[in-house]
Structures are given as C-alpha cells and as structure tokens.
C-alpha cells in the first residue's frame, strides 16, 4: 500500500480576458513550441472575428460549438482472443470537451487559408450552426459506436 497521499485534482485555470476555462483549454491545445503569447493572440483574434461575423457574444458561440462537437460515446480498440474489436465506451464531460477542442482545431488547420485566427473563427461559427468538419467527425464517431454496439459487453 502506498504511503503517499492521494494527489489533489488540479483546478483548470482561466484566461486573463474572458476568465473562462474553455478558452484556456483551447489556448493550451493550440500552443506550439511553448509560444503561449502567440496562442492567446490567435484565440483573441478569432474571438474578435466571431464577434464581427455573428454580432453575438463570442463566448456563447464557443460554448455552443464545443457543446455541438462533444461526443457522448466513442470506440476503443480492445484485443479479445486474437482479434481486435472496436468497443464503444461512454465518455466523461472533461474528456469529451478535450476531444471536441482537438477536433475543432484539427478541422481549423485543414481549412484553406493562411490566417489561423480566421480559420478557427470560421470553424467555430460553423460548428455552432451544426455544420463543419468537426461536427462530421463527431457524427462519424457516433456511427462507429452504433455499428459496433454488439461488442459493448467487452468493456
């Protein structure tokens, strides 16, 4: 038995301008080579573009986009007796949000154009409306889980 105490769960920090954890999660995922200032700059420019496009609060658009892309269920590869099955598993809220952010950023990076802030804002607006690559990815994941429902007892 371990003599060490249990580790305290880290509280997610919030960003300086919007004071929001989701924005901070987004910043930490967009971060490359430790350039956090640049990551913040990209996010805030994207938020400004969302404000101009939709004329609504960019935080509500971000929340709506992430809520729309967050999956409820995903598949996990599980090896059973020589063959690998895709086993559907339920996803917790934090993990779901992390996946949603990852998919939104991947879809943004795939978009044509040079400016990441513009691509991210476009993807967030599309996701909030219920279209876009990230939404397609979520639907694809749900379809995979539905198709492999027979293997749910392998959990």
From Swiss-Prot:
InterPro entries: Ribosomal_uS7, Ribosomal_uS7_bac/org-type, Ribosomal_uS7_CS, Ribosomal_uS7_dom, Ribosomal_uS7_dom_sf. Signal peptide: none annotated. It is found in: Plastid. The keyword Ribosomal protein applies. GO terms for cellular component: plastid; small ribosomal subunit. The keyword RNA-binding applies. Transmembrane segments: none annotated. GO terms for molecular function: rRNA binding; structural constituent of ribosome. It comes from the Eukaryota. Belongs to the universal ribosomal protein uS7 family. Part of the 30S ribosomal subunit. One of the primary rRNA binding proteins, it binds directly to 16S rRNA where it nucleates assembly of the head domain of the 30S subunit. This is Small ribosomal subunit protein uS7c. It comes from Lathraea clandestina (Purple toothwort). The gene is rps7.
């Amino acid at each position: 038995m371990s003599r060490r105490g249990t580790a305290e769960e880290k509280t997610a920090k919030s960003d300086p301008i919007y004071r929001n954890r989701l924005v901070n999660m987004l910043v930490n995922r967009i971060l490359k080579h430790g350039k956090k200032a640049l990551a913040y700059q990209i996010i805030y420019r994207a938020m400004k573009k969302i404000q101009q496009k939709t004329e609504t609060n960019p935080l509500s658009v971000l929340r709506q986009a992430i809520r729309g892309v967050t999956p409820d269920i995903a598949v996990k590869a599980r090896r059973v007796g020589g063959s690998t099955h895709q086993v559907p598993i339920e996803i917790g809220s934090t993990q779901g949000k992390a996946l949603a952010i990852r998919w939104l950023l991947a879809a943004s990076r795939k978009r044509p154009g040079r400016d990441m802030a513009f691509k991210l804002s476009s993807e967030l607006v599309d996701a909030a409306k219920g279209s876009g690559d990230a939404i397609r990815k979520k639907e694809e994941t749900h379809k995979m889980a539905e198709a492999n429902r027979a293997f749910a007892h392998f959990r």
